[in-house]
Amino acid sequence: MAEPGEQRKFVLGRCCIFHWRGKASIIIPLITLPILIYGFQTDMAEFKCLWLIVTMALLWITETLPIYVTALFPLVFCPLLGLVNASIVCKQYFTDTIVVFLGGLIVALGIEYSNLHTRIALRVIRIVGGSPRRLFVGLMSVSTFMGLWISNSAGTAMMCPIVKALVNELDTNKIFPVYMTQEEEPVEEGEPPHPSKITVAFYAGIAYASSIGGLGTLIGTGTNLVFRGIYTERFPTSTVEITFANFMFYSIPLMVIVNVTLVIIAFLITHMGLFRPNSKTGKIIAEANTNRKLMEDVLRQRHIDLGPMSCHEIQMAIAFAFMIVLLITRKPGFVPGWSDLINRKVVGSASGLSFIVLLIFALPTQYTFFKYCCGKGPFTAQAIDAILSWEYVLRNIPWGLLFLLGGGFALAVASRETGLNIMISKAMQVLIGLPNIVVQSITFVLANFFSAFNANVVVANIVLPILCEMSLALELHPLILTLPACLGISMVYFLPVSTPPNAIVTQYAHIKTKYFACCGIVPTIIGISVALVNTNTWGLIIFPESKSFPDWAKEIKNQTKI
């Protein structure tokens, strides 16, 4: 029988293990309390704001509280500590940027609800071909395209069942080994088998492609919208407006097309035996190519099983195309956009997206009632569904992300109003004199590193406001630092926790972390290199003003007395 002292230690140990969040939620604010006390003693709002940011950062990193709940802290503490009025803080939780994000998610759900994504994927894969390498290229291409227009997590979630269906067909027809053997990776009884090297490439490929596609447009990922919101809030007099069009022109040529091409080539070499015909993987692929006709027949049959394109799918495809046109032509930059021609009031991207959202909730999936109206068919007693169901949206929208974005914008406003940004800028002046490429590399690698262990949007909310102030202190155009860092935050390929697509595929396909981390080494190096080249070459063409420190930035710097 255990001694009473030993039993107490055992109970205490179990309590610490299973109830650590409750203790940490008290300990973390106590650890940061000296910052707040100093703020009250010196009556410096900067340190009160610093306490709030540090406390929220620690709670976000440790996930002591749900990250979405932590994002609500500014609603309580900004007014309570006298940092910002409650009315101003509340407005940050439903800005134009957040409405754009919400609209993009709803349109993505409309595509999923109509099953349009499956038809697009199968069509593209059939065009590309049925060999394993061609299948991989097709899956990567579809994932990249979807990542451009819908959130990368939604795109990955849509692609996973498609990949699983293909993998099951490959396994059934014995085209190549899709799972590891017991000798290669032992599995406990009842556990699912681990995917083979080639199968890992399929799943990791769609995750990386979705993340890369998300770099291409403002609605592709939450970090892009965080960047736009923070940049607009901090630099309201900037002559460079971050529009859907110029962000797209900046990112797609190099950050998306070149980046994904290099990543595809890297995967084909490392995981599919390209240029290595005598390797084990190369021999497996060569043997699988002999069954290419069988795989093409399977794909064709799956495509035929979908049947002809329904009225539901056609309408959703038209709405999707119309959304793209509205977003690009709102303010393209080189010619007046439709928002300039309508009236003198500012019409943001949220207006165009909201119109599409209203449209897909209003239009029916089919128009059989016209037959009755024309006397050519019986009366349909049943109600006809809309293109998108509100109940489906309620179940599938990640509402917490809206709070996360709003919390970041509220912190940015608090930093500006209290002067914390000035204090941070002065601390960054040690970097004055370093070449731009060196400063960019430092900020990019740090942003990438922190994103490896935390949610992308959380890191963006913490890092981007600091880089805005750093750019003023170093007298660099803010886009030179903030834009590549924004992209770097999304290009984290090492760990499952780094991005939502990574987490989705590792859980869905039961991929071990060590295999997933190995996949991410080369794509990360490619991403960092392409981002730095893009910023200092193509980026200077799209944003020519970023070559020098602009007058409006000088005025902001003088006003803040950096």
From Swiss-Prot:
Signal peptide: none annotated. One of its GO terms (molecular function) is pyruvate transmembrane transporter activity. Keywords: Membrane, Transmembrane, Transmembrane helix, Transport. One of its GO terms (biological process) is determination of adult lifespan. It is found in: Membrane. InterPro entries: Na/sul_symport_CS, SLC13A/DASS. PROSITE patterns: NA_SULFATE. It is a multi-pass membrane protein. The chain crosses the membrane at residues 24-44, 64-84, 93-113, 135-155, 200-220, 249-269, 308-328, 350-370, 393-413, 430-450, 478-498, 515-535. GO terms for cellular component: plasma membrane. It comes from the Eukaryota. Its main location: membrane. Cation-independent electroneutral transporter (not associated with membrane depolarization) of a variety of tricarboxylic and dicarboxylic acid-cycle intermediates. There is also small, but detectable, transport of monocarboxylics. Transport is through the epithelium of the gut and across the plasma membranes of organs involved in intermediary metabolism and storage. Belongs to the SLC13A/DASS transporter (TC 2.A.47) family. NADC subfamily. This is Protein I'm not dead yet 2. It comes from Drosophila melanogaster.
